[in-house]
Amino acid sequence: MERTLLLVKPDGVNRGLSGEILGRMEKLGLKLIGLRMLQMDAVLADKHYAPHRARPFFKDLVTYITSGPITAAVFEGENAVEKMRKAMGATDPAKSEKGTVRGDLGIDIEQNTVHGSDSAENAKHEISLFFSESELVNYDRR
């Protein structure tokens, strides 16, 4: 089974949207196997967003993601990455369809409420930044 990482960003947590967003992912048939809340520091943000380090928005991204608490979750399921990315919508909420997380809940391109892994390979790396294997729970979903 494929795994993927979901982060509810500070704007989502501050508006009390973590539960709604997690519920939307479970309704897709994805199984929640890891969950935690944390305050991301600059070191973790730098590791997580390393692929964007050379981009002009990197500093603002790190400032934003470290500005408040986040919810980190790992979901598992068939085509988990693709299902979650489709449910999240386009990066820019203004370009996201209604019915997607960002289309319904996102504020702007920076405060777009969620992050999701963009590939199964990247998901493995991202998950390892936030969770040890022993923190991920294997169970039969009924």
UniProtKB/Swiss-Prot annotation:
Pfam family, one: NDK
A cellular component annotation (GO) from this entry: cytoplasm
Main location: cytoplasm
EC number: 2.7.4.6
GO molecular function: ATP binding; metal ion binding; nucleoside diphosphate kinase activity
Enzyme's top EC category: transferase
InterPro entries per the UniProt record, alphabetical: NDK-like_dom (IPR034907), NDK-like_dom_sf (IPR036850), Nucleoside_diP_kinase (IPR001564)
Swiss-Prot/TrEMBL keywords: ATP-binding, Cytoplasm, Kinase, Magnesium, Metal-binding, Nucleotide metabolism, Nucleotide-binding, Phosphoprotein, Transferase
Subcellular location: Cytoplasm
Signal peptide: none
GO BP: any one term: UTP biosynthetic process
Binding site for ATP: 9, 57, 85, 91, 102, 112
Active site: residue positions: 115 (pros-phosphohistidine intermediate)
Cofactor(s) in the UniProt record: Mg(2+)
The reaction(s) this protein catalyses: a 2'-deoxyribonucleoside 5'-diphosphate + ATP = a 2'-deoxyribonucleoside 5'-triphosphate + ADP; a ribonucleoside 5'-diphosphate + ATP = a ribonucleoside 5'-triphosphate + ADP
Binding partners and assembly: Homotetramer.
Function, as annotated: Major role in the synthesis of nucleoside triphosphates other than ATP. The ATP gamma phosphate is transferred to the NDP beta phosphate via a ping-pong mechanism, using a phosphorylated active-site intermediate.
Family according to the record: Belongs to the NDK family.
Entry protein name: Nucleoside diphosphate kinase
Record organism: Dehalococcoides mccartyi (strain ATCC BAA-2100 / JCM 16839 / KCTC 5957 / BAV1)
Source organism phylogeny: Bacteria, Bacillati, Chloroflexota, Dehalococcoidia, Dehalococcoidales
Gene this chain is encoded by: ndk
